[in-house]
Amino acid sequence: MKRIWFAVVALSAVLLFGGNQTSHAQQGMIDLSQWTPPDIGVVGDDPFGKLVKYGHELFTNTANEIGPAVADVSKRLAGNNLACQNCHLHAGTQPYAMPLTGVWGQFPQYRAREGMVEILEERINGCMERSVNGRALALQSREMRAFSSYLRWLSTGVPDGAKLLGAGTLQDQGAGTAG
């Protein structure tokens, strides 16, 4: 009888505690392929909304806004005609295509390439200098505030530090290569 009682108690503990570990892990996971990004069309015209809209414009039309042929020489911050969304598809919302949904809550983070912990604005400048062959943005510039406001807005509803299924690329996920 003691063996049966022990087995019932042990099985109950495994089901109670072991099952919760799985559900807790799943609760912290967000599948970006099932995620609906916020709608840029409903962003307000308050100061934050204006920065979000400008950030979206910078992100989707980088060369037209800050590229090498912009009429205002002081705005020539990017050194080529790429747009941010050439790498981060669909304005940074496409799963498995280096999406930026939820990235706001992933920083600061350790960056192996730089060998240090970076804030989001430093990572943005990494893209500015390497990917678009441009100049680093001043941390308090309108452009930097717009980029970071856009990324903050894009992360609306994603808990800080959430595990994001679909972040990175297909190759990063071990699911093959991006096609």
Language-model regions, residue ranges each:
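Helix-coil boundary and N-terminal low-complexity module in membrane systems
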Residues: 62-65, 80, 91, 97-102
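Local sequence-structure signature of Cys/Sec-based thiol-disulfide redox active-site neighborhoods
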Residues: 69-81
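Short cysteine/histidine-rich metal-coordination sites, predominantly Zn2+-binding motifs
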Residues: 74-75, 100-109
